Amino acid sequence: MNLHITKSKNAESFYICKSYTKANGSTTSAIVRKLGTLEQLLPEHGPTRDDVLAWAKNEVKIETEKYKKEKEAQTVLIPFHADRQLDYNKQVFFRGGYLFLQSFYYQLQMNKTCRKLKQKYKFKYDINAILSDLIYAKILEPCSKRSSYKVASEFLEKPSYELHDVYRALDVLGTECDLIQAEVYKNSHFLGKRNDKILYYDCSNYYFEIEQEDGNKKYGKSKEHRPNPIIQMGLFMDGDGIPLAFSLFPRNANEQISLKPLEKKVLEDFGCQKFIYCSDAGLGSESIREYNHMGERAYIVTQSIKKLKKDEKEWALNPQGFKRVSDDAPVDITKISEDDKGLYYKDEPYTTKKLHQRLIITYSPKYALYQKSIRDKQIERAQKMLDSGNTKKNRKNPNDPARFIGTLAVTKEGEAADVKHYLDENKISEEGQYDGFYAVCTDLLDDEVDDILKVSEGRWQIEECFRIMKTDFSARPIYLQDENRIKAHFLICFLALTIYRFLEKKLGSKYTCEKLLDTLKGMNFAEIQEQGFTPLYKREAITDDLHDVCGFRTDYQFITKSKMRNIQKKSKGKE
């Protein structure tokens, strides 16, 4: 509603008008109520014109509130005809799950970051719409960039760009990858304080659907033993499981060299100066520990017991000297039952040439039983291989059951050797001695063991980050060739993961990844005779929670077009 004033030769008239959109998309207005002329209104609402104007504006406000209440309470009657066919090429299905992701996209002020890019490069296409749609599609329907454009065309808000603009935008996004990461981190504080006093780091590889290595895409060993060229991604994550920063490097390069350039970026561009670095043993070399011992930084890294010196290994595996983590009570771990749920530890100073450290050994009967059960199954498979004569020549995988098969060459003088295979009991016994044991090394000499172990246990979240990107967001295989566009691909995956993690955190981590993603994918709408929309999803506790954390609701039996536009505005932080 708005106040409309007309002036003629004889009078000044005041009207309350309502604007609306016609079927062809044009806007017009209609008079809702005539308030009267200035001459008529002055005696009751004067004595001045300003007094009349103030009264008239208040009447508009009252009329607007009245209209809204009537609109919300009204019953909508829309005629359908059983003998009328559907219109050609008329879209009636619309995806709406992106609205909840959009709420976090705009809270991260990524639209403002895109505005900076537009001012810098002077392009005409809408990079904010392109980036946001690519992120939403990555979460809701992971597919190629071309297919993502088709997915976006099913959103309630249509793409305001063409497909060729998407590929142009990828070049810019790849070039400005570091800037965007820094901006997202800075703006993420609008969503609450970041737990950036603990930073986890890990690497994972991604393969390409190409035959020849090129640039950063190098041949290398992957867990799946694929022959395709591979690139590695290094990822920093905060203590709440939310991504912080990433970098890319060739697979044939040592993953340890990936850390320092990215950590330097975190130190300088993000302003994170005081934190505990946490990683697995593969990314916890002596040089990495020294690097994270500088300034206000510290480290907690896993330590391979097998790689300890002889006397340190003997101390670690000795059952004496352990204490219960919960109360520090001394315990002889040889006397506790297999089904004991407790965790036990011992620690000692662990000094190298340059570092004064602390080595913490833990023992878990539950973990020991788990490791033994896994190995027993592998031994069974090894025995079956021996019985069938199907033994492997190459046993490079540390989890391959064939590692338990020994080879013995028996020969008589002057004759060729007979090769015999057998179950290697010594190998089995050697592995068994490590069951249940785990080691952590840190330069936090005075902190409580329980606190140190809790930080180390949080590493599962960064492993889950990679799993979500690879499995749920289909970050691999990669079909792009250009280096900048490859960077943009990973940037989109990174941003999708960041938004997903913030949403997950806001929901209190109540729901599994599968449940949350399935719910978002299912929150769709059907357009009814161009009058509005009806939800196509089932209302549940999770949909109520999504609406509560995002500050709008879509779970009405019918949503008028004007109300849906208001919902879209709210999802962008506009009232």
Region locations from a protein language model:
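Dynamic "connector" segments at or just before major functional cores
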Residues: 1-212, 216, 227, 236-247, ...
